Swiss-Prot record:
GO biological process terms, semicolon-separated: protein N-linked glycosylation via asparagine
The name this protein goes by in its record: Dolichyl-diphosphooligosaccharide--protein glycosyltransferase subunit 1B
Major localisation: endoplasmic reticulum
Family: Belongs to the OST1 family.
Keywords, alphabetical: Endoplasmic reticulum, Glycoprotein, Membrane, Signal, Transmembrane, Transmembrane helix
GO cellular component, as recorded: oligosaccharyltransferase complex
Lumenal side: 28-439
Residues of this chain annotated as glycosylated in UniProt: N307, N361
Membrane topology: Single-pass type I membrane protein
Organism: Oryza sativa subsp. japonica
Regions of this protein lying in the Cytoplasmic compartment: 461-473
Compartment(s): Endoplasmic reticulum membrane
């Protein structure tokens, strides 16, 4: 009895293993099995405090694989933490007729790659057919990825930073050939990791070419170099946009700014700073450039003390540039707060859609150039009586509504609040806020003002005709 039972169990296990093998063999190939990277070129720009990476991928789908509707990108956990934006385009056409079609990029729902790497999906406009070859251009920006070393410097020291990455492309696909270029702001490169073949020409280090890299390959490298660009970090940025249908858009921007580079140690000598500008405080910054909308008016720049006169405005019909100077130069770890305000002509920014709704068209992001915004808030205050507000922004963010009150308001003004963290210059794109508005509400405040004046005169007349004298009883 026992031998027959053992034989039955063995036969059952054999059938289960055979079924599992058939299931695995008939299942569609995984993405890393069906797509391969023919060539990859990675260019890393370290000339500013923001790390900018340009990636060119030439991909081929396997001849026996089904159509691929997406391409996966892999990022390390550290890169995901500091990732500000990812954009991708696909090259279509040949030579002079070649165009680059923007593609949607989002975090993938697939399981993470080895070592905690996170996958992002590039959604292709048209599926990649079997044996088809295509080229993708990818751009992404990393903030707070440069580590000052030494962490503290004196007024006369240059600023040195570390940058960590991989000599080979981290990818879920098999990479046949690849090369990486790292560009620094100057020729002063203290050291860099060598992974043969590695070469250096001036301010650029080249890694590769490397051939036949397996999926999820990673070779850590470290670059130590001089970067004296101002590490301007806006810890908190709040923009308030107030719309008046009487002809004006008033904008108020509040900044909490800090120098995010190597911490300043020792005393500060203004005499040395002014007499030796090429040596003293080379990594500090004493002015900033803000790119404002065209045709701005009534511009002011002030801090908690009062107006700051050290600013210069250049404005025309195409752009406006405001150069501002804080009351003191900013060194590593130093902070300052200030406010910029200006007005805009209503007819240039408020429009009416085909369905009768009104919408304001503005630029998202921070107007200060080459800055990182840790926490950004935009408040669009709609005219009193506005209903059905809707914000259209080309990327994910937090949105909610609140009510604001101003002079002569009765029910308050609907305010659309937009919040986003880790904002860079590539986020400075147009966005719209749609709303419905009954023109009768434009008469509310004038009627209240007229009524108040009328009641005041009635009270004055009544007072003049009142007999307040004390008569004899």
């Amino acid at each position: 009895m026992a031998p027959s039972l053992s034989t039955a169990v063995s036969s059952l296990l054999l059938l289960l293993l055979l079924a599992a093998a058939i299931s695995v063999s008939s299942s569609p190939p995984m993405p890393e099995d069906s797509i391969r990277v023919i060539s990859a070129e990675k260019r890393i720009d370290l000339t500013s405090p923001i790390v900018k990476v340009f990636l060119t991928l030439k991909l081929e789908n396997d001849a026996t694989a089904p159509e691929a509707s997406q391409v996966l990108l892999a990022f390390t956990p550290t890169e995901v933490e500091h990732l500000a934006i990812v954009k991708a385009t696909r090259a279509e056409g040949k030579r002079k007729k070649k165009i680059y079609v923007p593609l949607s990029v989002k975090a993938s729902d697939l399981a993470a790659a080895p070592n905690g790497a996170r996958l992002y999906s590039i959604l292709l406009s048209t599926p990649l057919k079997p044996a088809e070859v295509t080229t993708l251009e990818v751009f992404y920006a990393l903030t707070h990825s440069l580590e000052p070393f030494p962490a503290e410097i004196t007024q006369s020291d240059p600023q040195l930073v570390y940058y960590r990455d991989s000599a080979v492309l981290l990818s879920p696909y098999h990479v046949l050939e690849q090369v990486t270029y790292i560009k620094m702001p100057s020729n002063r490169v203290e050291s860099f990791t060598r992974v043969d073949p590695t070469s250096r020409a001036g301010n650029e280090v080249k890694y590769g070419a490397y051939n036949n890299q397996l999926p999820n390959s990673y070779v850590p490298i470290l670059v130590h170099y001089e970067n004296n660009r101002p590490f301007a970090v806006v810890e908190e940025f709040v923009r308030k946009v107030e719309i008046s249908h009487w002809g004006n858009v008033q904008i108020t921007e509040q900044y909490k700014l800090k120098h995010g580079g190597a911490q300043h140690k020792g005393v500060f000598s203004r005499l040395e700073y002014q007499s030796r500008p090429s040596i003293s405080g080379v990594s500090s910054f004493k002015n900033l450039l803000a790119r404002l909308p065209p045709r701005v008016h009534s511009v002011y720049y002030r801090d908690e003390i009062g107006n700051i006169s050290s600013s210069h405005l250049r404005s025309d019909s195409h752009k406006s540039e405001l150069e501002i100077e804080p009351r003191y130069p900013l060194f590593g770890g130093w902070h300052c707060t200030f406010t910029i305000g200006y007005g805009l002509p209503l007819q240039d920014f408020l429009f009416e859609s085909d369905d009768g709704r009104r919408y304001i068209n503005l630029t998202f992001g921070c107007p200060l150039l080459d800055t990182v915004v840790d926490d950004l808030t935009i408040k669009v205050v709609l005219p009193e009586g506005s209903t059905s507000p809707q914000a259209v922004v080309p990327f994910l963010m937090e949105q909610y509504l609140e009510t604001s009150y101003s002079y002569l308001d009765v029910v308050g003004r609907t305010t659309v609040v937009l919040k986003k963290r880790n904002v860079v210059g590539e986020h400075n794109v147009p966005f719209q806020v749609y709303y419905e508005f009954n023109p009768i509400f434009m008469l509310a405040e004038p009627l209240m003002l007229i009524s108040a004046v009328f009641l005041f005169f009635v009270a004055c007349i009544a007072y003049l005709h009142m007999d307040l004298s004390i008569g004899k009883s």
